[in-house]
Amino acid sequence: MTSSTSTAATAQAHGRFIRGSVSKVRRVLDQIRGRTYRDALIMLEFMPYRSTGPITKVLRSAVANAENNLGLDPASLVISSASADMGPSMKRYRPRAQGRAFQIKKQTCHISIAVAVQTDS
């Protein structure tokens, strides 16, 4: 993207303890980073990944924060940063042969999205 963003008017939202691996969430975030709010919503709607649901919720929350707290127009917003960090793993046990048990880790992640006003340069 050729447009730059302003750091003065930035709104952000976080989704914490989201079920799903970090790598699968980052795969989607890499595709919407730097895009406008409308383009990102359209892309998320038609992507075949399970992680698009929580990402859409966090994106809508960030835009609502920009609209209500900063008075910004949603049509002029661009995703300035989007990241996913590792959360705690839930440990479960699966019974195996001869009385053994294998550990299964159900991964979680933290999603952070920041939106800013798009400036034409």
From Swiss-Prot:
GO terms for biological process: translation. Coiled coil: none annotated. Keywords: Ribonucleoprotein, Ribosomal protein, RNA-binding, rRNA-binding. One of its GO terms (molecular function) is rRNA binding. It holds the Pfam family Ribosomal_L22. Gene3D superfamilies: Ribosomal protein L22/L17. CDD domains: Ribosomal_L22. One of its GO terms (cellular component) is cytosolic large ribosomal subunit. Belongs to the universal ribosomal protein uL22 family. This protein binds specifically to 23S rRNA; its binding is stimulated by other ribosomal proteins, e.g. L4, L17, and L20. It is important during the early stages of 50S assembly. It makes multiple contacts with different domains of the 23S rRNA in the assembled 50S subunit and ribosome. Part of the 50S ribosomal subunit. This is Large ribosomal subunit protein uL22. It comes from Synechococcus sp. (strain CC9902). The lineage of its organism: Bacteria, Bacillati, Cyanobacteriota, Cyanophyceae, Synechococcales. The gene is rplV.
